[in-house]
Amino acid sequence: MSILNHFFDYKPEVLALDEKAMELCQPYFRHMEEIRDFNQLKMLKAFADTQMSSTDMLGTTGYGLWDTGRAKLEQIFAEVMGAEDALVRSQFQSGTHTLAVALFGLLRAGDTLLAATGRPYDTLEGVIGLDGKGKGTGTLMDYGVQYDEAPLKADFTPDYDLIAKKAPGAKVCHIQRSRGYLQRNAFDLETIRKIADTARAANPDIIIFVDNCYGELTQTQEPCQVGADIAVGSLIKNPGGGIAPTGGYIVGRKDLVELCAYRLNAPGLGKELGCTLETPRDMYLGFYYAPGVVCEAIKTAIYAQCMLELLGKNPVPRYCDDHNDIVTCFDAGTADALIGFCQGIQAASPVDSYAAPEPSPEPGYTDEVVMASGSFTQGSTIELSCDGPLREPYTCYLQGGLNFAASRAGVLLAIQKAYFKD
């Protein structure tokens, strides 16, 4: 009997698929483990270089002045991310909030934001003010910032000619590394480099801005090492390692990070303020563990992609592709299959496993959405979770997985509930 059936009741045909998928995935697992090992040693070196000590994890209150633990954590982030400086704070509430702080920090009235990888995902539309969203609430457009975009081509690749044409009039060139709700692969670092080179050749002063959410530590380099001036992400995604309870980061050129700090705090205060309370230990530990956790999440993605491909689905990316974020998307085919898949993920979660996700209206979505997230941290996407809108072709987005053993069980249960019903 498979060890899996000691704890969950899987059908023989599901276990047969599992056996085949595990065999096919081994070389791709080993590749990710090599990336993990490189990044873990890079992480260890950064911790040692800062001479981080146990007292740095104690936290501060009030203003947070002279917080050496906060300063050392930011130094570690900067070194690991290949940047001059970093702003790593628990005061960032989400990835969207962190992105908003960075954009407002860099852009002024009359400046133009160029979205070089097409329209950003939904939550940023309200920050920018696209299509009148959030009008009068303090969007970038409310403050006189202009918006332009270079849509992706039909094959979801950047339109470099259009980027070169539009870059001279822009202050910031925005690159979204992950797919959002498009069925495309995440952009690899060479693509980010080429976008940066193209925009900078047309406008040497343009600021290359990368939304790095879901992409951290998936490769051995980061965007600031391939031409980005600033990169932004969330600590309840990859770099928090499933341990950081909240927060975000901004890394990049020192002068630009300082501008972002003025926006987060106040002009004249910059990085000097911001108490850490009881968060430093979790933020240090989460970042230290992040290379291993990201590896487990991508192994989960590779395995899920292989299983889905064996079932005749067409996941993006494929299990044999290079992986530049932790997200998998595929067309479930029917509403029942999408709901069943989400219910299987939830049933094999450590938190709220007894819940059965059902479609419901969600703010910002035109269709009902079904979501599964049995996570320790609310909204965490480095923990195994999935979601999808109830509209054809019933696309499901799967991400995360703190450890492969448990995530494998979840994927199997999801596939069984979706495609092997009695």
Question: Predicted segment positions?
Answer:
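Conserved PLP-enzyme active-site core in the AAT-like
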Residues: 3-26, 33, 42-56, 65, ...
